[in-house]
Amino acid sequence: MVVVAGMLASCSDSAEGVWLGECCNDTIGGSKSGVKMSVKQNEDKIEGILILQDNLYGSGHFVGYINGKDLTIRSEGDTQTFVNITWTGKMKDGVYKGTYRVEPTPSAALLGKQVQKGTFIMRRQ
């Protein structure tokens, strides 16, 4: 499951569109990887695809809802994901930035995956 959480700057801001950016993994020496999020928004409902481009965690489909200024997105990852990812940040003026935390599922922990955290920034394309 991939979990994305953040804040919208105002109710009029939309998360709709393609977001491209970069993650910096503080746990393993600041290594960087690309991230892409494709979002469709229908009023307060959000859905889309999140792809981590380093192939360490795969991709996942997510659905979520906006409640006022809060944006919370939770998703089930595909069979190659095996982790829960929480993104916490702010979306404002076409930029989404903040921190993330990766927690392995029990099956991924058995394969040696560990908790990781870092920062991210994505820009609307």
Per-region residue spans from a language model:
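Bacterial N-terminal signal peptides
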Residues: 1-6
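C-terminal motif of bacterial Sec signal peptides marking the signal peptidase cleavage site
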Residues: 9-10
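Central antiparallel beta-sheet cores of small beta-barrel/beta-sandwich binding domains
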Residues: 13-95, 99-125
